[in-house]
Amino acid sequence: MSIQVFCDFDGTITNNDNIMSIMEKFAPPEAEEVKNRILSQELSIQEGVSQLFQLIPTNLHDEIIQFLIETAEIRNGFHEFIQFVNENNISFYVISGGMDFFVYPLLQGLIPKEQIYCNETDFSNEYITVNWPHPCDRLCQNHCGLCKSSLIRKLSDTNDFHIVIGDSITDLQAAKQADKVFARDFLITKCEENHISYTPFETFHDVKTELKHLLEVKL
């Protein structure tokens, strides 16, 4: 049995949710209604996120990238956490509902590209189109967009110890099949509603401390 860590990006590795930051800065007012319908689960994540990005003109590409580089902050303790994970030969994957055009640049030099799974974007038309290279498998019918639970099944063994780290509704299905959940913000609410055991965290120092203890117990 090996330990596999599956970590969200927006609002988890970064302090802010980059998709929401983009929408607040660049999207028209109707984005707010779409966002609320995603959070209430009235819209699937795939439907909602597609609709959100269809509100953003592609000619804002460079401006959006510059905005995120200036405003996105990596959560405290993440660098040390990754060092600890690497030193202990723990498998680590970023499974993000975010977009390639900002996830890859913000993680450059921290996480190898082959350990990052995110959505793809097309800027060839007037508005941004989202492509979904990691859809739900036959065991999930939630139209997740990037299906985190399907990726966990694809990347790991059923005998592995699965750790999920996340903050929002997009992490709920993954949390349902995890052996250990680190949660913050809205994911805490969803875990409690679904009776999922979780450990709250604010920084990756918290996660590292708990993971270190877990390794000691398992060894």
Swiss-Prot record:
Swiss-Prot/TrEMBL GO biological process terms: L-methionine salvage from methylthioadenosine
Keywords noted in UniProt: Amino-acid biosynthesis, Hydrolase, Methionine biosynthesis
Pathway named in the protein's UniProt entry: Amino-acid biosynthesis; L-methionine biosynthesis via salvage pathway; L-methionine from S-methyl-5-thio-alpha-D-ribose 1-phosphate: step 4/6
Catalytic activity: 2-hydroxy-5-methylsulfanyl-3-oxopent-1-enyl phosphate + H2O = 1,2-dihydroxy-5-(methylsulfanyl)pent-1-en-3-one + phosphate
The protein's enzyme class: hydrolase
Taxonomy, superkingdom: Bacteria
A Pfam family it matches: HAD
Family: Belongs to the HAD-like hydrolase superfamily. MtnX family.
Role: Dephosphorylates 2-hydroxy-3-keto-5-methylthiopentenyl-1-phosphate (HK-MTPenyl-1-P) yielding 1,2-dihydroxy-3-keto-5-methylthiopentene (DHK-MTPene).
Xref: NCBIfam families: DKMTPPase-SF (TIGR01489), HAD-SF-IB (TIGR01488), PRK09552.1 (NF007103), salvage_mtnX (TIGR03333)
Stated name of the protein: 2-hydroxy-3-keto-5-methylthiopentenyl-1-phosphate phosphatase
Organism per entry: Bacillus anthracis
